[in-house]
């Protein structure tokens, strides 16, 4: 940055290059507001040959610790006056001050120009008391190469500073300055204030010792950006020209003592440089170094000084180098546009208005003091949407944005540690707070008051989206058996005129797998998402029974049947029960309707077989397939069928003789036997009947009933083809296991027919079946079951038949061997 412009009157003279820093503070001693007209005198240019590092260490960063003579932990409160503290600095100790600024505490990176103050060179500082009094001291010519702004401490009637030259390496940690009460001046130091101004305002600055600063000009410039922020941050949130530098009771100033012009690219835009020393990179006060963040942010106590003057230097209108933009920001991404907007070229000169305009703005500032105090107490440490006009704490231009002054002063882009420092003296008098509150502040979200709670209540409590199983588990309310479980269905039969169904009781042992559809989660009255409650929402045409989990639901069966109908028959291959029974979609829907109308358990068993809920023998499945499941149910229930019955079932119904002493199944079996024998030999209807009877004889329940028709079936062994013989032999093989029918089965006529099957022309399967039949009867004879059942039973026919059977078996074996090896047979 080149030399600073010095303005005399209302005309700026850029040729002036002062090396002084002027900082004034108006000390409020009475209730009446005091407005001091700043006096401006031209400054003598600096004659330093080398450009020293002139960034001043802001007391808000260095935090000079004021060892008060009052009791530790207490705070002096004086109505209408700033608290006085007889301060004595301890040599060798790191200075430490309170973070509260007088009148309107501003965050460390904010500077707000106040109307009525006239810029003076590069070193600009306006003192503003907590009640709106502004004063600018009359600066005498003092060749102070570097100075540190110091909070106003009234000791007696005047304050004289005494500097000690220390090593710059330990300047920040061990810089000592003793403040003595008196009116005599120190030798070698010219007074900064006039005689009548010094008594009212006190000393705001003290000369900072410079040991090796002139020897490290270049390194100081390179390290100047290592300020209170980390190195990745933009060193300027918003470019401040020298005319706009303005703070309320904690202003900064920076001296440019270098006479030669040297452009600065990355060192010019400062936010708040802590120090201009060459050891800035290793500064223990540097932000995010990890060891001094508490010293930088937290207010130590209420009894300390309430202001931290800060350093602000900025001549350029905007960044001179684009490298400044890439650095990260303190603020949210949404604030980038506000912070980095380019300023108009005329904007730096907007503050150079005539004195009439500035006087008017001074009056407005005094009138807005009550508003300012409220803004100071509240602060603006919220998110971007709260204080976007403040531009993240950066000071706005006086003439362009006069309304944002209060928000900018009270604003802060830091976290909640700085909120206690925004209260200033007005906050001390309005709201006394605990020491912990001043130290820690509020760690909560916006609109929370600064408080210290060891167990704070969070703003938002995360709740589980899913219900805890233990909450729903209630063993006392759970059903003990399936009989206690009732499900009420809503089938579509009501629209067809059928009576309303009663609640269906699931039988014991049945597995429940009814479809459940969870309703979408609804938002409660408070906008919080409620747990989704699964409610039973069964479709109207759904089959009102529970299925085993291994089987498909009604909707899945519907989709499967529709897919089968849309596919080509030759391309469709499926082994499910519906495909095996050849149930169509229309027939399946009729079956569901019948299930709602009929309560007969036997009909329900047939329907369960068709649905895949019950396993059945191959005979039963074949019978249902050949007759049709709907036609079969309608025939059994004597319901008028809505379809044309199959010829097989129709003939069975009409031709069946009345059997009043037999149940429905026995009557049906008798009808099947008579229908099978009555059909022509080897006809499809006869084969269907034989297949049905073969499956019916798997169990012994109907053996005696079917044995009455054995003579007719034996006749088929002599007249039928190989396929017919196979089905007849399979049925007789099932009967051979039962001793009750063995006498009829192994009669003399039957044995001769069986022996006649042992020939070379008979198929191997049929011969194997006959052999198994003789083995079964042999086992029955050996067990003695035949003699127990029938005393008149004779074994002679069986013995002769067995001998003949053995001879035929040997001859058959020889014939089979000869067919396999013709040469050996010859």
Curated annotation (Swiss-Prot):
Keywords attached to this Swiss-Prot or TrEMBL record, sorted alphabetically, are: Phosphoprotein
Please tell me in which tissues this protein is expressed.
Strongly expressed in the brain and the cochlea. Also in lung and muscle tissues. Localized in multiple structures of the cochlea, detected in the spiral ganglion, stria vascularis, spiral ligament, inner and outer hair cells.
Q: Does the keyword Nucleotidyltransferase apply?
A: no
Q: Which GO terms describe its molecular function?
A: amyloid-beta binding; G protein-coupled receptor binding
Chain spans, region Disordered:
1-126, 204-286, 336-371, 506-534
* Gene Ontology terms: biological process: hematopoietic stem cell homeostasis
Read off the Pfam families from this record: Arm_2 (PF04826)
Q: Which domain of life is it from?
A: Eukaryota
- Renumbered to this chain, the Basic residues biased-composition regions fall at 248-264
Q: Which residues carry this modification: Phosphoserine?
A: 275, 277
Question: Which Gene3D superfamilies does the entry mention?
Answer: Leucine-rich Repeat Variant
This entry carries the following GO cellular component terms, namely:
cytoplasm; nucleus
Q: Output compositional bias ranges, type Polar residues.
A: 59-73
* Biased composition range(s): Basic and acidic residues: 13-31, 231-247
Similarity field: Belongs to the GPRASP family.
Assembly with partners or alone: Interacts with cytoplasmic tails of a variety of G-protein coupled receptors such as muscarinic acetylcholine receptor M1/CHRM1 and calcitonin receptor/CALCR.
- So what does this one do? May play a role in regulation of a variety of G-protein coupled receptors.
Q: What is this protein called?
A: G-protein coupled receptor-associated sorting protein 2
Write the lineage as a comma-separated list. Eukaryota, Metazoa, Chordata, Craniata, Vertebrata
Gene name of this polypeptide: Gprasp2
């Amino acid at each position: 940055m080149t030399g600073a412009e010095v303005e005399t009157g209302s005309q700026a003279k850029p040729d002036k290059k002062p090396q002084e820093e002027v900082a004034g503070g108006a000390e409020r001693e009475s209730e009446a507001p005091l407005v001091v007209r700043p006096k401006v005198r031209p400054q003598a240019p600096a004659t330093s040959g080398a450009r020293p590092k002139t960034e001043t260490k802001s007391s808000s960063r260095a935090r000079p610790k004021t060892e008060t003579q009052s009791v530790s932990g207490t705070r002096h409160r004086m109505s209408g006056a700033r608290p006085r503290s007889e301060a004595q600095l301890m040599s060798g100790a790191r200075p430490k001050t309170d973070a509260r600024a007088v009148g309107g505490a501003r965050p460390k990176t904010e500077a707000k120009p106040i109307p009525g103050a006239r810029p003076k060179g590069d070193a600009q500082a306006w003192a503003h008391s907590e009640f709106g009094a502004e004063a600018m001291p009359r600066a005498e010519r003092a060749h102070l190469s570097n100075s540190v702004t110091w909070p106003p401490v009234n000791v007696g009637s005047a304050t004289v500073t005494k500097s000690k030259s220390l090593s710059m390496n330990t300047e920040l940690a061990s810089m000592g300055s003793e403040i003595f009460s008196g009116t005599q001046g120190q030798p070698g130091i010219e007074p900064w204030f006039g005689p009548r101004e010094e008594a009212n305002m006190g000393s705001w600055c003290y000369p900072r010792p410079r040991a090796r600063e002139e020897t490290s000009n270049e390194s100081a410039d390179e390290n100047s950006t290592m300020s209170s922020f980390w190195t990745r941050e933009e060193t300027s949130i918003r470019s401040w020209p020298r005319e706009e530098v303005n703070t309320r009771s904690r202003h900064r100033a920076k001296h440019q003592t270098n006479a030669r012009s040297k452009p600065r690219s990355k060192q010019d835009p400062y936010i708040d440089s802590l120090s201009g020393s060459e050891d800035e990179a290793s500064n223990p006060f540097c932000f995010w170094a990890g060891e001094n963040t508490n010293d930088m942010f937290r207010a130590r106590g209420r009894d300390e000084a309430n202001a931290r003057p800060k350093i602000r230097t900025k001549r350029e209108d905007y960044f001179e180098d684009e490298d400044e933009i890439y650095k990260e920001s303190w603020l949210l991404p949404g604030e980038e546009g506000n912070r980095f907007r380019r300023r108009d070229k005329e904007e730096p000169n907007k503050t150079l208005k005539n004195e009439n305009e500035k006087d008017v703005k001074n009056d407005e500032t005094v009138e807005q003091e009550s508003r300012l105090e409220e803004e100071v107490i509240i602060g603006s440490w919220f998110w971007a949407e709260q204080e976007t006009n403040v531009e993240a704490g950066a000071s706005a231009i006086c003439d362009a944005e006069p309304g944002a002054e209060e928000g900018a002063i009270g604003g802060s882009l830091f976290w909640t540690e700085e909120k206690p420092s925004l209260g200033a003296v007005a906050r001390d008098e309005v709201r006394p707070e605990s020491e912990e509150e001043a130290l820690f502040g509020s760690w909560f979200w916006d609109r929370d008051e600064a408080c210290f709670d060891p167990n704070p209540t969070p703003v938002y409590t995360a709740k589980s989206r899913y219900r805890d199983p233990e909450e729903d588990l209630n063993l006392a309310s759970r059903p003990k058996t399936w009989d206690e479980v009732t499900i009420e269905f809503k089938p579509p039969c009501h629209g067809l005129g059928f009576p309303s169904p009663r609640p269906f009781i699931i039988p014991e042992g049945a597995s429940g797998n009814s479809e459940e559809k969870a309703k979408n989660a609804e938002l409660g009255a408070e906008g919080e998402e409620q747990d989704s409650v699964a409610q039973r929402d069964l479709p109207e045409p759904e089959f009102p029974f529970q299925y085993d989990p291994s089987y498909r639901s009604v909707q899945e069966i519907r989709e499967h049947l529709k897919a089968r109908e849309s596919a080509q028959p030759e391309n469709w291959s499926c082994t499910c029960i519906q495909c095996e029974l050849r149930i169509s979609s229309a027939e399946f829907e009729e079956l569901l309707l019948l299930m709602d109308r009929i309560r007969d358990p036997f009909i329900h068993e047939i329907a369960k077989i068709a649905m895949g809920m019950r396993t059945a023998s191959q005979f039963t499945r074949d019978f249902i397939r050949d007759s049709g499941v709907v036609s079969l149910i309608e025939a059994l229930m004597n319901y008028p069928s809505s379809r044309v019955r199959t010829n097989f079932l129709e003939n069975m119904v009409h031709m069946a003789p009345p059997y009043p002493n037999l149940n429905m199944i026995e009557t049906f079996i008798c009808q099947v036997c008579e229908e099978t024998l009555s059909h022509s030999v080897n006809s499809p209807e006869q084969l269907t009947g034989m297949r049905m009877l073969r499956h019916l004889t798997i169990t012994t329940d109907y053996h005696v009933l079917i044995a009455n028709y054995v003579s007719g079936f034996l006749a088929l062994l002599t007249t039928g083809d190989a396929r017919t013989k196979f089905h007849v032999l399979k049925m007789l093989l099932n009967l051979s296991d039962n001793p009750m029918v063995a006498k009829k089965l192994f009669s003399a006529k039957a044995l001769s027919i069986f022996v006649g099957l042992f020939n070379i022309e008979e198929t191997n399967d049929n011969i194997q079946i006959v052999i198994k039949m003789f083995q079964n009867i042999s086992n029955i004879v050996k067990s003695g079951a035949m003699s127990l059942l029938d005393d008149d039973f004779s074994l002679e026919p069986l013995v002769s038949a067995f001998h003949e059977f053995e001879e035929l078996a040997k001859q058959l074996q020889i014939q089979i061997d000869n067919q396999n090896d013709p040469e050996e047979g010859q």
